[in-house]
């Protein structure tokens, strides 16, 4: 089920925020199997750690800008306002390169959330290994690691995760219907997510099933809970918040695929 890509269309230098990265940094334009264009850039950043404003606190780390999962309901699409990207959400990815973290032990006791506005384990992580590099730099610290993902690639880094005293891995699962999942995102199948959750749980690492977003009339919360209850330490719930650009997209999908749920279609 690994994503298939073919054909590098161009390879050119890229300037980011007015700075020209070193010569090894390039842009690749890749065409997916359906010929949808996806632009991959490698960029240099000064610091990958950001003080988090999320309720969970601590620090937020996003090894990438953008996310190829292209979830139709993704709140992180607002990031385009700050990065200057004009491409549609899900069709660009900036791969961050940063200087080695200075004194990693300063994060002892701090919660570090990996993947608040991207997925650190999307398919390209298999090649770029930026999330793994981050974990390697934090190895030996007492930082509390929290990973948010829709992937099973996190299993690759189980060797590193076992070395931290406090680790939580959360998977977003808002359906058991694979067709609906395919309509909403390009991440791995629900079965692969749940299988990874079980393996991480059996390895002694705390797991979370994040039922988000809940689509009224579509998401069967009870069925998901019954499916994961034996290997999810925590279950989090989040409502569907329709706002911005994706409100139009989601409502268009509902009218087409589930007209019975659209109040406008009810006479």
Named regions from a protein language model:
Residues 5-8, 12, 16-19, 31:
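Short, positively charged and aromatic/hydrophobic N-terminal segments
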Residues 25, 31-170, 176-180, 190-195, ...:
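Conserved Radical SAM active-site core
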Residues 173-177, 239-242:
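Short, acidic/turn-prone active-site loops that include or flank metal/cofactor-
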Residues 192-249:
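Conserved C-terminal portion of the radical SAM core fold
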Residues 258-262:
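Long, charged alpha-helical interface segments
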Residues 266:
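Conserved small/polar residues in nucleotide/adenosyl-binding loops
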């Amino acid at each position: 089920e690994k994503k298939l890509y073919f054909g590098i269309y161009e390879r050119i230098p890229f300037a980011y925020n007015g700075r020209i990265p070193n010569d090894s940094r390039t842009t690749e334009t890749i065409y997916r199997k359906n010929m949808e264009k996806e632009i991959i850039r490698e960029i240099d950043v000064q610091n990958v750690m950001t003080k988090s404003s999320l309720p969970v606190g601590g620090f937020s780390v996003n090894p990438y800008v953008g996310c190829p999962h292209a979830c139709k309901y993704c709140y992180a699409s607002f990031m385009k306002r700050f990065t200057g990207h004009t491409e549609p959400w899900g069709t660009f990815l900036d791969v961050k390169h940063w200087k080695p973290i200075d004194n990693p032990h300063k994060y002892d006791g701090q919660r570090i959330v990996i993947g608040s506005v991207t997925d650190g384990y999307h398919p390209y992580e298999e090649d770029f290994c930026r999330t793994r590099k981050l974990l390697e730099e934090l190895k030996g610290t007492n930082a509390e690691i929290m990973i948010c993902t829709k992937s099973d690639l996190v299993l690759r880094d189980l060797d590193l995760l076992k070395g931290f005293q406090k680790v939580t891995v959360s998977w977003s699962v808002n359906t058991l219907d694979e067709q609906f999942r395919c309509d909403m995102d390009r991440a791995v199948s629900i079965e692969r997510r749940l299988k990874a959750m079980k393996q991480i749980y059996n390895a002694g690492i705390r797991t979370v099933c994040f039922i988000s977003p809940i689509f009224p009339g579509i998401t069967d919360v009870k069925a998901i809970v019954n499916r994961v209850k034996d290997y999810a330490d925590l279950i989090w719930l989040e409502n569907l918040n329709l706002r911005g650009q994706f409100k139009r997209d989601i409502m268009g999908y509902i009218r087409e695929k589930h007209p019975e749920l659209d109040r406008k279609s009810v006479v």
